[in-house]
From Swiss-Prot:
Pfam families: CheB_methylest, Response_reg
Highest classification ranks of the organism: Bacteria, Bacillati, Bacillota, Clostridia, Thermoanaerobacterales
GO molecular function: phosphorelay response regulator activity; protein-glutamate methylesterase activity; protein-glutamine glutaminase activity
Processing and modification events after translation: Phosphorylated by CheA. Phosphorylation of the N-terminal regulatory domain activates the methylesterase activity.
Domain CheB-type methylesterase: 165-361
Domain Response regulatory: 6-123
A Gene Ontology cellular-component term: cytoplasm
Catalysed reaction, written as an equation: [protein]-L-glutamate 5-O-methyl ester + H2O = L-glutamyl-[protein] + methanol + H(+); L-glutaminyl-[protein] + H2O = L-glutamyl-[protein] + NH4(+)
Keyword set, alphabetical order: Chemotaxis, Cytoplasm, Hydrolase, Phosphoprotein
Protein purpose: Involved in chemotaxis. Part of a chemotaxis signal transduction system that modulates chemotaxis in response to various stimuli. Catalyzes the demethylation of specific methylglutamate residues introduced into the chemoreceptors (methyl-accepting chemotaxis proteins or MCP) by CheR. Also mediates the irreversible deamidation of specific glutamine residues to glutamic acid.
Catalytic residues (UniProt): 177, 204, 303
Domain of life: Bacteria
Protein name in UniProt: Protein-glutamate methylesterase/protein-glutamine glutaminase
UniProt GO BP: chemotaxis
């Protein structure tokens, strides 16, 4: 018999604890081994019971979720799925939790909670399953990993390009899902302000969170980071975050022929919105393949893998995050297995690779 996923449910609301317990125990491969009503209880039970996954509320008495998360990651590292409020303040707190080691989050519904939480049952179950597959060794080593990154990148952030102005349109497309916010924080802040390429980031994320995510990244990066807008020009030295609930595509402006972003609901049938494949395909249709860099980071499934193959066929550079640092080695693995990854590297080396390659692209003669 297959081993069940052992879940610890943490929420200060008895009603929410009961709802989450019912949702999870309705699945044959899951069992709720215990519940906790505050962060203090959560830490004690995490150490004592060693669950496979914890669902964690943020706003709780005695000890809040963020404090509890730090103790859990230090004393009993475990994949954590945050159950968070869909408010501006809630979104910012959620990203702080993701940077501290939580692997994913589910937005608590507004209005009637009893109806809303049941509508989210499929999402909750799916994210708990994916969390159970995450690389637990990375959770326990996250603090040392961050220290290594800070040390290694002190000089990198001060690099200045000899060729600041390039006539080439160099576009970097990054696709990422579960574990993405933490991984992106290990790459984007180490790119200099004169980075001569535009960066498009497609992070699987629900509506209402990507604006706060872009703002948080903007505070940490040398590059300008913003949420995608319809009909906005794509400029070098800018990071554009795909808007939750919309596909991000690239087109040519009819007057200037410059690259612009478009937000669209089509195609409707994709599993994710935004979709990595959709964005990469549109970039391939509008930019010389030799000036494209495709990157696939941590995440479940295979979104982006097919287009990584196409980018490589057209002469672009493709990079897949290695299993060494991927929280969930799904999407990068798919790219590697399909022959879509020219380079396979841990997250902490990707900024260096980008700096080197984009500088080479910018300095070579025009095609």
């Amino acid at each position: 018999m297959k081993k069940k996923i052992r879940v610890l449910v943490v929420d200060d609301s008895a009603f929410m604890r009961r709802c989450l317990k019912d949702i999870l125990e309705n699945e044959e491969d899951m069992e709720v081994i215990d519940t906790a009503r505050d962060g203090n209880e959560a830490v004690k039970k995490a150490v004592e019971l060693r669950p496979d996954v914890i669902t964690l509320d943020i706003n709780m008495p005695v000890m809040d979720g963020l404090t509890a998360l730090q103790y859990i990651m230090s004393l009993a590292p475990c994949p954590v799925v945050i159950i968070s409020s869909l408010s501006t303040e809630g979104a910012l707190t959620t990203f702080e939790a993701l940077e501290l080691g939580a692997v994913d989050f589910v937005a608590k519904p507004g209005g009637t909670v009893s109806l809303g939480i049941k509508q989210l049952a499929d999402e909750i179950v799916s994210k708990v399953r994916i969390a159970a597959l995450s690389n637990k060794e990375l959770l326990s080593s996250s603090r040392n990993f961050k220290k290594l990154l800070k040390r290694r990148n002190q000089e990198v952030t001060r690099k200045v390009y000899e060729n600041k102005i390039s006539k080439k349109e160099i576009v970097v497309v990054i696709g990422v899902s579960t574990g993405g916010p933490k991984t992106l924080m290990e790459i984007l802040p180490y790119l200099p302000s004169d980075f001569p390429a535009a960066v498009l980031v497609v992070q699987h994320m629900p509506p209402g969170f990507t604006q706060s995510f872009a703002q948080r990244l903007d505070q940490s990066c040398n590059l300008k980071v913003k949420e995608a807008e319809d009909k906005a020009f794509i400029e070098p030295g800018t990071v554009i975050i795909a808007k939750g609930g919309w596909h991000l595509v690239v087109e040519r402006d009819s007057r200037s022929s410059k690259l612009i972003t478009r937000l669209t609901q089509k195609p409707e049938e994709t599993l994710y919105k935004p979709s990595i494949n959709v964005t990469m395909k549109s970039v391939l249709e509008n930019v010389d393949g030799r000036n494209i860099i495709g990157i696939l980071l941590t995440g479940m499934g295979d979104d982006g893998a097919d287009m990584m193959v196409e980018i490589r066929k057209r002469g672009g550079l493709t990079i897949a995050e290695s299993q060494e640092t991927a929280i969930v080695y799904g999407m990068p693995r798919a790219a590697v297995e399909r022959g879509g990854a020219e380079i396979v590297a841990p997250a902490y080396k990707i900024s260096d690779i980008l700096l080197k390659k984009v500088n080479e692209y910018a300095r070579t003669s025009e095609y």
